[in-house]
A protein has these predicted regions:
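Hydrophobic alpha-helical segments that form the core
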Residues: 261-269
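ATP-binding pocket architecture of kinase catalytic cores
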Residues: 2-134, 141, 184-187
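A general structural signal marking secondary-structure boundaries and capping sites
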Residues: 25-28, 71-78, 151, 172, ...
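Active-site Asp-x-Gly
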Residues: 128-140, 192-195, 202, 206-258, ...
Length: 291
């Protein structure tokens, strides 16, 4: 078997990926297929080398339906880490908070240039009162505010992001999960969020002769619409067929298409923090749309 070996000496990086792949793989029947980990150590992992082919619309539809079932496998709460992993994770080169519960903090940090990825505090654990914490508050405080810094955004740009975060925290932009996730939440008291890949841009879906395979996750409890939105950030083959099949298997809430850009704000903010101002106009366009 032809294999690939990934190495990363930074603490916790490999452990997070291995735990995330295993967690997603638990749902791979009937959920989406996941690349297997053949072997791993503290600073490396080995996977089979996957052959790549051009996807057909049929395979894309199969992936959409399977992804709906992966999400419905559930997670305990928004931001939940994969079982067996403790601490914060990463999304590409950016630190990613994985709180025990969403932090009980306000958005004032945004206007003050909240912690940038290079100022993150891994190991700082967060708590809150219940699994019913709102998506908007979580998204504002954990997925937008940490990536605002005075070296990337102007004062006016930070103020606009703060307005978006205020609206998110108010709850006016909250919305339910797709039907299968909501049904899982109603059946099981230990499920409060979707089980998400967390970094599902199109490059992290391998189209193989046997179908779509997920790779390189930032696995976490999240909102299912976040994965669907991420697929569109850089374009995805047969995207509309994926969405249609997903929506057939697990109907999305009213207005889901109008929320795609909102769910893309996280990945765009990370790109601003990591790559600089070239992504700022896109972040500003999203913020203006939803304030």
């Amino acid at each position: 078997m032809d294999t690939i070996r990934k190495a990363d000496s930074r603490r916790g990086r490999i452990a997070y990926e291995v735990a995330g792949l295993a967690w997603l793989a638990e749902a791979s029947d009937p959920g989406a297929a996941v690349v297997p980990v053949l072997d791993h150590g503290a600073t490396w992992l080995e996977e089979p080398r996957l052959a790549s082919v051009s996807p057909t619309s049929r395979v894309a539809e199969e992936f959409g339906r399977a992804l709906a079932h992966t999400h419905a496998a559930g997670a305990s709460h928004l931001g939940a880490p994969p079982p067996g992993f403790e601490g914060d994770g990463w999304m590409g080169e950016a630190p990613l908070s994985l709180p025990e519960r969403p932090r009980a903090r306000g958005i004032a940090e945004v206007g003050q240039g909240g912690p940038r990825p290079d100022h993150a505090r891994p190991g700082e654990r967060a708590t809150a009162s219940s699994r019913g914490d709102s998506w908007g508050a979580f998204y504002a405080c954990e997925r937008i505010a940490p990536y605002v810094g005075d070296r990337t955004f102007t004062a006016a740009e930070r103020a606009l992001i703060e307005k978006l975060c205020e609206r998110l925290e108010s709850g006016t932009l909250d919305h339910g999960q797709p039907r299968l996730v909501e049904e899982a939440k109603s059946r099981q008291s230990n499920i409060g969020a979707a089980r998400t890949h967390g970094d599902l841009w199109s490059g992290n879906v391998m189209w193989t002769p046997g179908g779509a395979v997920l790779i390189d996750p930032a696995a976490q409890g999240g909102h299912a619409e976040g994965d669907l939105a991420a697929l569109a950030v850089f374009g995805c083959p047969h995207y509309e067929r994926i969405l249609a099949a997903y929506n057939e298997a697990s109907p999305l809430g009213d207005g889901w298409r109008e929320r795609i850009a909102l769910h893309q704000m996280h990945i765009i903010m990370i790109h601003c923090a990591v790559f600089g101002r070239s992504y700022v106009p896109e972040a500003m366009a999203i913020a203006r749309r939803y304030v």
